Amino acid sequence: RLEVFRTHGKIYEASASQMFGVPIDLIKKGNPEYALRQKGKVAELALGYQGSTGALINMGALDMGIPEEDLPDIVSRWREANKRIRDLWYAMDNAAVQVITQGGSIGINGLIITREFDYNQGTDCMTITLPSGRKLYYVSPGIGENQWGNPSISYMGMDQKTKRWKRIETYGGKLVENCVQAIARDC
C-alpha cells in the first residue's frame, strides 16, 4: 500500500490488480479490465476495517452495478490480497479478548492493549496505548457471545444514534479503525 502511494497513487487500480490478478497497466479507461477498478474502489472503501458484504452494499456496490452474488467473492479476494491487514484485525480482537478475560498487557505493532483498574475512582477500562503515548479508553469492557457463537467484545459508551450511554459491541477491525484514526490525529 505504501508503495502505491509513493509511486502512482492508483489505490483502486492496485487493489483490483491484486484481487483479480490482472496487471495494473490494463486497468485503464478504454480497456475491458477498467470495470475491475470499480470493484477495487468499493472494496478499498468498505473492507479495510473488517467490513463484509453488508458494508459493500452500504457503500453502494449494488448501485454501482456490482451483482449481489459477486460480493462474497470480492470480500474473499480483498482479504486474501491484504493478509497483513486481515491478520491485524484478528490479532487486535484476540488480544482484546485475552486482556479483558485475563488481565495484563499485550503489544501489537507498536500498540499496547491493557486492562486498567483504578480502585480509587472505581473505573475499569481496557486501554490501547498509541505510539504517541496517548490512550484510547474502553470503559467497563466485557466479553459476550456474538451471533456466530464467538467471543464478542463490548464496552460502555455513547450510542451514536440515540446519544444514550449503553453497552456497545466492537471487534478487531473496529479497534484497528479507532487506532488508525487516532494515530493520524496524533501526527
Segments and roles (model prediction):
Residues R1-C187:
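Conserved catalytic core of nucleotide polymerization and phosphodiester-bond processing enzymes
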